[in-house]
């Protein structure tokens, strides 16, 4: 007997629509320029509905930014499931590149928030992100001790991956200009392979 997949509740559907609309509005207008009315219009719901789920613009903005970070953290699950650094790093970089492709607006919002000094999410950086980075540092240091990775600084490796992958979202217009159009799926996959080969090939011990 096939197991039925539960349908999302009305609340889940509404929250999802509002978050998607907010992501687009914040990316285009910034936090200061975005309005709850414009977000409601994008989501196709009455403005009171937005306030019902997210009582303030600040709460909605934080929810959008946290969702972006949670997607990125989930992309690194390979660190927990693989003892092979080449496999884990390849999976992580590939997932981060794919997120840059399908969630470019979220990456732009994150970059804007960080450039503003992270006023909305500093506590999140101090706790969730810091704990996550420390846990990944321990994994990388273990791989180094086991002779699987070259003696590198774990945080520099993470910063390199973040900067390279998020460039394809944050600078999408610049890339499209230089490439005379948006990257095709095939061109994007070639870029992904080259990034993986460069980073992974540069840190894995041979």
Regions found by a protein language model. Give the residues of each.
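Amphipathic alpha-helical linker/stalk segments
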Residues: 62-91, 136-141
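Amphipathic alpha-helical segments used for helix-helix packing
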Residues: 101-123, 171-178
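C-terminal peripheral helix-coil segments that are non-catalytic and often amphipathic
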Residues: 1-3, 98, 102, 130, ...
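Helix-turn-helix
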Residues: 13, 17, 25-59, 63
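N-terminal intrinsically disordered/low-complexity leader segments
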Residues: 1-13, 20
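Hydrophobic alpha-helical connector segments
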Residues: 77-108, 154-161, 189
């Amino acid at each position: 007997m096939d197991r039925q997949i539960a349908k999302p509740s009305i609340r889940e559907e509404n929250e999802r629509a509002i978050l998607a609309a907010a992501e687009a509005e914040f990316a285009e207008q910034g936090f200061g320029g975005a309005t709850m009315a414009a977000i409601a219009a994008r989501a196709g719901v009455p403005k009171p509905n937005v306030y019902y789920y997210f009582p303030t613009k600040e709460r909605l903005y934080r929810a959008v930014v946290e969702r972006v970070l949670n997607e990125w953290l989930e992309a690194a699950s390979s660190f927990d499931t693989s003892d092979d650094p080449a496999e884990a790093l390849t999976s992580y970089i590939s997932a981060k590149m794919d997120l840059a492709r399908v969630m470019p607006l979220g990456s732009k919002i994150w970059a804007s928030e960080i450039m503003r000094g992270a006023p909305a999410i500093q506590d999140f950086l101090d706790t969730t992100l810091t704990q996550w980075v420390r846990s990944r540092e321990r994994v990388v240091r273990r791989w180094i001790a086991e002779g699987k990775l070259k003696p590198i600084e774990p945080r520099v490796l993470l910063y390199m991956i973040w900067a390279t992958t998020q460039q394809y979202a944050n600078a999408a217009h610049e890339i499209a200009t230089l490439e005379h159009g948006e990257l095709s799926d095939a061109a994007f996959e070639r870029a992904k392979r080259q990034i993986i080969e460069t980073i992974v090939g540069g840190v894995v011990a041979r």
